[in-house]
Amino acid sequence: MHLDSSVAARLINDIQDCHILVVGDLMLDRFVDGAVTRISPEAPVPVLSQSTSQQMPGGAANVACNLAQLGARVTLIGACGDDATATDLAAELQHFPRITFIPVTVAGRPTSLKTRYRASGQQILRVDDEVSIPISDSAQGELSDRVNAVLDTADMLILSDYAKGCLPLTLIRSLIDAARAAKKLVVADPKLADLSVYRDVDVLTPNLQELASAAGTSLTELDAIGATAARLAKTHNIGTIMTTLSARGILASQGDGTQFHDPARTRDVFDVSGAGDTVVAVISAAIASGARLPFAVALANRAAGVAVGKSGTAIVTAGEILAHMPLSKPVIEANALAGI
């Protein structure tokens, strides 16, 4: 199967009709750039002379922004604090008119803020201002109520879990059950090693480290990765496990042994911030619009290639993905990965 620009354009056009509900950990990503010209006299550390600062939505909010840039209608729900970071995040999201933002405000809880300091484009320090304890039972109840209020109008539920406390285990399970009862597609970007929590989801999107953690073993060879993912998919009744493999692309595995592997395309890597969110967004949007699995994988892989070439938390446009199409190659489809 071959994904060319005309096929990709049709897939992206179909995304315009989708309403996708994103629930998960909200973050604000801040980037401080400057130059290092001396070492501090107070300690043997570099002194950064700041020149610019920018901020953008991160975590589940970045997934929502990527979906909106593809043309989907998005409802974003998550917990945040009653602080300046939450105000800044809401202001940034106003730049995306296709996103309806429904925050659950938790008094006294800091909104996750990740500040990256860069010198000459090279990250030298990251400071995380956040807590990771689960949100309170009352906040979980409020979040669940807000999800259920809009679930019937959505085509898909995406759970974007960064293990920052917005999605405790019991809440994940209840949201999946509610979505299945409403006959909605469910995609989960997991952080928990116990994949039984994600039972019955349509798509699970771990990276290789997360898959290995779930399997309780190290994984390096492609055939072993595929076999392990297929086994876990069958065990937990997961439709497809899409494992992101960094420089090796994306591998989709199903419980019956079906595999789709799309190798990564060589590009200069500038910044990987948010690239995983881009993959989740594009795969989800393509599947929600009715795209076949190999095409969804290939489209997401092209988007990832664009994302890593960008500075800051990546938000990829439809035009950028289409411009990347000349590098596309056939998707490998096989029931066994021998010889790959």
Spans of features found by a protein language model:
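Short acidic, glycine-rich surface-loop motifs adjacent to enzyme active sites
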Residues: 153-166
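Conserved post-catalytic alpha-helical subdomain immediately downstream of the catalytic base
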Residues: 235-239, 265-328
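Conserved phosphate/ATP/ADP-binding segment of small-molecule kinases
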Residues: 164-259
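Substrate-binding N-lobe of the ribokinase-like
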Residues: 2-11, 41-113, 141, 324-326
